[in-house]
């Protein structure tokens, strides 16, 4: 673990005497498909701890990472190079003690409490074990006797399905979108658990990101631009064929840039369809493609999630932050988020 350096001895306010962050990849410091001690120190939770001048212990992961982050977006080279191990494990603790960043990459709305028996409980992936050591996020949080808590959870309830282009749960392809009823149960269990921690004096609940605005999804219509098409083909490692019937300049579909990697690896044919092909199920045109109807479904689900989170923040006396207006503004500015990934 590591303690964030602070300039003064005391926090800016007693409210921040002990700050704990609960969440998933973004909170943990996961970047570029990997995580290590450098990316962990760039987490917004670490930056916030510095702003309020409070000690903040993070469960450091040795370089090159677990897994190592991508060092080159085009070639997909990893930090540490071709010989890098898939996981360099946790760093040794100089001074054992409670951790303040209990977030785990891949966590869903169920994860902080792990209250329901099943595969999505205490042990979801190796990082769950390395970071939490067999406990839940809430249990680990309570050990730090937090006075202030931030919670950003729920993105993974919709992200994987949005990026795969398949909204129903489909083994080997998509985790599916968590139903609003299930999300409600999970989140209320989390709030109930937070209310049971007597040291908490305040906090903030952060809303779920509308995943149609994530930078890795780009407008399929851009592929009609030869420059964009050339850049995509370079990433795919071959000249791809654009289906003229579904990929017209007027299409509103979104494409996950990971489609290029799937084509390069041979997992997807070098033909791009921008709309779903006929049922019962045709992966081409479905996988990695989010059409107009799917975008509406995702947006409606996220809106329902966030209405619940805002209401639960009120019951706790916490602040609620909706990240979507700021993220949408960033994506609308090509100087901040390029229309096509680069």
Functional labels for PLM-detected ranges:
Residues 15-18, 56, 144-149, 197-203, ...:
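Loop/turn elements at helix/coil->beta-strand transitions in domains of secreted/extracellular proteins
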Residues 30-35, 60, 160-165, 214-219, ...:
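Short, solvent-exposed loop/turn and secondary-structure capping segments
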Residues 19-33:
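Catalytic nucleophile-elbow at a beta strand-turn-alpha helix junction centered on a G-D-S/GDSL motif
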Residues 35-189:
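Conserved SGNH/GDSL esterase-like catalytic core that processes O-acyl groups on lipids
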Residues 1-17:
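Bacterial Sec-dependent N-terminal signal peptides
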Residues 22-25, 151-156, 163-164, 206-210, ...:
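Active-site-proximal beta-strand/loop segments in catalytic clefts of secreted hydrolases
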Residues 217-300, 304-342:
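Mobile gating loops/cap/lid regions near enzyme active sites that modulate substrate access
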